[in-house]
Amino acid sequence: MNQRNKGVLYVLIGAAAAGVYLEVKRHEREGTLHGPGSAATASATPSAAPPSSATTSAATGTSSAPPPQAGELKGSDVQALHDAIGERVRKGASDAGSPWALAHGLIAFGKDFKASDGQDAVDAIAKQLVKSKGPDGKTQWSFPPGSAAAPSEPHPHLIVDVLLQVGVNPKRTLVTQDGSKISVQTLIDQALRGAQDPSNEVEWMDSPWLLDLLTRDPKGKPRATRLAPITWRKLSEETQLIADYRGAPAAAFENGTPLYAAKRNKTQIYGHHCGGLHFMQAALSLEASVNAAPASVAPELDRLLKRIALERATYNALANMTQGVPISRLLWVQGLKFFGHTAETLGLARELGLYDPTTSEGKRLDAALRALAWDLKRVFDALAKDGAYQQLDAIKSERVQTYLDLIGDGCHAMRGLTRALPAFDQTEK
């Protein structure tokens, strides 16, 4: 495969579920789908191609892959999958020089996670904070710029929000780069003091961690109450194109559809980080903070289920077409991102009490959570046979974003599986 065609396929599969179905078929017809891979993309034939029933339905567009039948996976299987992913991502997530990596380690392993140098990840993060003067003349703490392979804090307020998400005490003492002693509360107060409400698309894109943070501190609660309906309306507007789609699932992202255009142009929900799933999680946290009724949240959760069906159908079709192609690895990496973040999002809604798992609607949502765990198993099995996690050093040097996705999205998948476990417990009672 020449470099141009190889590059085209990187874009196509890297933008999985973005209208690539017809493009991959075109490359298949033209004979440009196969070819030798680089050190970072060479792979065996994936083992997790979807079952024939799933790929058939995806190819015909009649439905998305059916949820697994009860009993296909048990809670113990989900825990084993969680632990297996953990074995693969722990080293990368413990990078003592990357606050971003350590924050993802905290997400996956909890507040007592250790950095690669043996200290608590929270302490390793704190030691990279540097002091400066803020616009208001007050002392400000921030992270120095990271590197491509060891990001620092790519999204505003990411680190402090994660500390609170995983249960770090706001009173905990942090020792900074210059030896100063501050508390987690210092970082919270700094964020709440300096952050403005989102008012344009760029600010909305970077807003999830601030919005979630507002729900976790008493001083942020009034703003959370005020922003909850605004944020929910914004989410509804940006997912409307999903509700509007009426075609076959496997055709949802074909060239010419509104979903294809939104994904290609990074607009509406697809303009946000990780497909808008962080934004939806923040919106759910805001809704829970104002004690929103499950009935008011249900329409948006229904859109999420529809989106899962549409994207699953496209992933299944692409997996069928690219089976055995070296760069199919990128498809599985994108699947790890989507299914992991989606399980994390739907599981958060359950955790926050935004749906009742004993009702018929709640049982449907729990079934979707269990199906997402099955999706993650197929994806991880494919990556395991592909050897992606065994080749992390080569991937890191050649395709650093793929490396970061394997680590970061693996951590989000772990939290998604943790949040999905109660849906399995419900069926096993």
What is each model feature region?
Residues 1-12:
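N-terminal Sec-pathway targeting helices
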